[in-house]
């Protein structure tokens, strides 16, 4: 049997051909508008956001200037000038009266004053060196975005000289031999960061690893909290001084305070989540709590915080920004800490002295 034919369907509208795409009119940009366009860079955007956050915190922590503060500073300045004038007048009167004992006291006081002024000048110079290092890092970041020729090599030679790298160092000679006239500034800086900069970075990483391990072991075996706090504070201060010395920076009192402030700010905003993630990874995947004691787990946490402090101090003292994954990871120090604690601490059956 055959099916009946379906009736014809008539459409009121005629078939339309394929629609042509609607093109937008061309847009012509002048030089000023072209300068506003820049390639997207997630790393630079992250750094800018971190810098903005740090700037906001610095502005919040910075005391606001007021009229009372200016009056206090003016009064102190007048008091200092009056003291200097009185001191000079006293020396003149002692000379006129031939009071040699008073002149001896004046000479000793003058030596103390000049020593204090010299100390302030040296502190200012050290603080200036820390500020110059930050400017050098900004210059290196700009050279990494620059495709010109001629500035990169001069900049890197300056960094090698400041770091105290000898001229016959194999890494420095290899870098110089690899340079070619066709290399732009970005390529020159990248080669320096890959071949010469690791000479110092490896020493700094070893120092951070050793200090983190000592802090972790001290917390794991020490029975007194006050001893732990004093030891950790001393080791952290020594770690920052050592990192700065390896990178060719001499820290004074004020520059050390400034570096501590920057390090702690960075840790507060970017370190807490990383520490929690690393510790949680160990507890969930390797069951650290079942293998080590509670004191050992506390030691791992303190060791990770010490390592984080060293990494941020390394970042602030380093003359070059991190390039293509050169930044040390907290997980590397975590594995070293766990291995050392497993090898040194007694077995699970033996209790650690509380």
UniProtKB/Swiss-Prot annotation:
Keywords for this protein: Cell inner membrane, Cell membrane, Membrane, Transmembrane, Transmembrane helix
Family label: Belongs to the UPF0283 family.
HAMAP family listed in its UniProt record: UPF0283
Membrane topology of the entry: Multi-pass membrane protein
Pfam families: DUF697
Domain of life: Bacteria
Organism: Photorhabdus laumondii subsp. laumondii (strain DSM 15139 / CIP 105565 / TT01)
KW Cell inner membrane (keyword) present: yes
Compartments it resides in: Cell inner membrane
Organism ancestry: Bacteria, Pseudomonadati, Pseudomonadota, Gammaproteobacteria, Enterobacterales
InterPro entries on file: DUF697, UPF0283
Membrane-spanning parts: 71-91, 101-121, 214-234
GO cellular component, one term: plasma membrane
Name used for this protein in its record: UPF0283 membrane protein plu2581
């Amino acid at each position: 049997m055959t099916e009946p034919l379906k009736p014809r369907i008539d459409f009121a509208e005629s078939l339309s051909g394929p629609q042509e795409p609607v093109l937008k009119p061309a847009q012509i940009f002048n030089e000023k508008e072209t300068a506003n366009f820049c390639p997207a860079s997630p790393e630079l955007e992250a750094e800018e956001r971190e810098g903005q956050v740090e700037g906001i915190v610095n502005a919040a922590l910075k005391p606001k200037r007021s009229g009372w503060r200016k009056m206090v500073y003016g009064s102190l300045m007048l008091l200092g000038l009056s003291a200097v004038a009185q001191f000079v007048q006293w020396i003149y009167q002692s000379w006129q009266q031939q009071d040699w004992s008073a002149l001896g006291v004046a000479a000793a006081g003058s030596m103390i004053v000049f020593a204090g002024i010299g100390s302030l000048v040296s502190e200012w110079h050290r603080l200036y060196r820390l500020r110059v290092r930050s400017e050098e890092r900004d210059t290196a970041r700009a050279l990494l975005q620059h495709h010109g020729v001629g500035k990169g090599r001069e900049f890197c030679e300056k960094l090698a000289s400041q770091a105290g790298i000898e001229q016959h160092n194999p890494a420095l000679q290899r870098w110089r031999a690899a340079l070619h006239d066709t290399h732009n500034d970005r390529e020159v800086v990248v080669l320096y960061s890959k071949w010469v900069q690791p000479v110092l970075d490896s020493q700094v990483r070893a120092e951070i690893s050793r200090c983190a391990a000592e802090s972790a072991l001290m917390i794991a075996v020490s029975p007194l909290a006050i001893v732990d706090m004093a030891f950790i504070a001393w080791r952290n201060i020594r770690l920052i001084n050592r990192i700065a010395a390896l990178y060719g920076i001499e820290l004074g009192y004020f520059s050390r305070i400034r570096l501590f402030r920057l390090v702690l700010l960075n840790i507060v905003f970017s370190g807490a989540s990383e520490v929690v993630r690393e510790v949680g990874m160990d507890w969930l995947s390797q069951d650290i709590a079942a293998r080590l004691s509670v004191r050992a787990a506390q030691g791992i946490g303190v060791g990770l915080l010490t390592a984080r402090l060293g990494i941020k101090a390394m970042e602030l003292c380093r003359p070059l920004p991190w390039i293509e994954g050169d930044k040390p990871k907290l997980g590397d120090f975590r594995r070293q800490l766990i291995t050392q604690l497993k090898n040194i601490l007694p077995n699970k059956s033996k209790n650690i002295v509380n």
